[in-house]
Structure formats: structure tokens, C-alpha cells
């Protein structure tokens, strides 16, 4: 029995080291933290705004609901041409603004490796939990501003192995 326990622990350590070795770290990326705050209580924010007072059905709505303490971090990333964030995921949602350049992202769950292109002045939502990569396939720096809401104390980025669905 003792031998089986040692074997299980050894296998677990081996697998954890292999998964770390298979991770795809960022390249050509510089990140600056703009600010970080801990929200110790649940967040329940709901707003409904009448965007066309003459029409009873034109409302814009937003909901943020968390259970447990949360961290909100705002960062700015600069990605050199040819650089990428590497394959990764997040434990919570992020709102991403493309400040300059062009972001191209790919999802690990997409067997066709379809590029999703986001231009300067546009944004996108990373809902969290999905494995993806963001690349700068342009000729100028890509600058993004990201607001991430995650469980308190968690790392905002989780390195992931290359899923093998893209040729790069």
C-alpha cells in the first residue's frame, strides 16, 4: 500500500511538471498594472437605462453578479509585432480594449483555428474559462487595456498547453 501511495504521488508530480513544460508562455509582451482592488463582499450591480425615451422597449442593461470576494485588475499590455500571449485562460471575465494596433485571437475549442480580428478602438469580452491565444500579426505594436474580474487571490492568467488546432 505504501508503495502504491509513493507511485501515485510520483506520477502526480511528474504530470504537474509535464503540464508546466507544455505551457506556451507569452513572447514580446510587456505588461503594466494600472490598478488592482479587492472587493471583499459579493457584487450585485444592475442597471437599466432607457436609451430611447419615446419607445417603451429600448433599454440598455448590464448585470454584474459575484459570490465571494473578488479582485479587479486593470492592466495595459504592449505586444510587439510577431508577439503573442501564448495559450492561456482566465478564472473570470475580462473586458479588453484594443488601444492601438490589431489583435487577432484564436480559440482552442475551434478545430478550424478561425482568426478573430479586433481593430484599434474596438473591444471584446473574454468570458473566462476558455483556452485562447492573442497574437499581434501586424507590423506595429498592439496595445490593449484589460479589466479583469477574478476570484480574490487567484492569478488572472493560467498558462495552458498548445491545443494543437492551429499550425503556429
Question: What positions do the PLM features span?
Answer:
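Glycine- and acidic-residue-biased ligand/ion/polar-headgroup-sensing regions
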Residues: 90-111, 120
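Ligand-binding loop in jelly-roll beta-barrel domains
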Residues: 119, 128-155
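Histidine-centered divalent metal-coordination motifs
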Residues: 88-90, 132
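A short, N-terminal "cap"/entry segment at the start of jelly-roll beta-barrel domains
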Residues: 4-7, 13-71, 115-117, 161-168
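Short acidic-glycine-tyrosine-enriched beta hairpin
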Residues: 79, 109-129
